[in-house]
């Protein structure tokens, strides 16, 4: 999928994009990543291995910036994660995602945001803000659990505190 930058992200075909050569967001999977990177004018010499992504990072290459994201699934914080690559050059953004996570984020941006992607910087801000948007809700839920535990401790109900605290600590470390 290709989304043309503008006040509204507009999905366009590859043929339309090749005629216009306008700045855009390319969304692809790892099977089509090399081809999509070439179309977008991005040179990346390393192998794309989504399964090996273990953390979030951004690094500068000669012609682009490359980022990897490893985001815990909020319903299973200790379990599986969303993994993807993001490539950014002077004009384009390429997202390599083997699941539907990025597609859902882009659809949410299109549905909720007034200024969706006039520039690649605005798009990147919206994209990252969108997957962080539920973090506050999750942290509030943890705060409530910890406050209940604090109340239990203040009433000398300390028998199970350690057993209740360790899973919370592990989950928070993964977020």
PLM region descriptions:
Residues 69-175:
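Extended amphipathic alpha-helical scaffolding segments in membrane-proximal extra-membrane regions
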Residues 1-114, 145:
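Helix-boundary and N-terminal cytosolic regulatory elements
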């Amino acid at each position: 999928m290709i989304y043309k930058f503008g006040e509204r992200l507009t999905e366009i075909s590859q043929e339309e994009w090749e005629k216009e050569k306008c700045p855009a967001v390319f969304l692809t999977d790892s099977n089509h990543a090399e081809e999509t990177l070439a179309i977008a004018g991005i040179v990346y010499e390393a192998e794309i291995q989504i399964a090996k992504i273990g953390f979030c990072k951004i690094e500068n290459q000669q012609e682009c910036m490359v980022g990897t994201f490893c985001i815990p699934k909020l319903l299973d914080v200790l379990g599986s994660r969303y993994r993807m690559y993001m490539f950014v050059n002077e004009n384009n953004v390429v997202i390599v995602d083997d699941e539907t996570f990025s597609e859902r984020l882009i659809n949410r941006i299109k549905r909720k945001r007034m200024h969706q992607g006039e520039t690649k910087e605005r798009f990147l801000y919206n994209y990252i803000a969108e997957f962080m948007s539920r973090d506050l809700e999750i942290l509030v839920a943890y705060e409530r659990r910890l406050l209940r535990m604090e109340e239990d401790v203040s009433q000398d109900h300390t028998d199970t505190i350690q057993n209740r605290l360790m899973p919370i600590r592990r989950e928070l470390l993964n977020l």
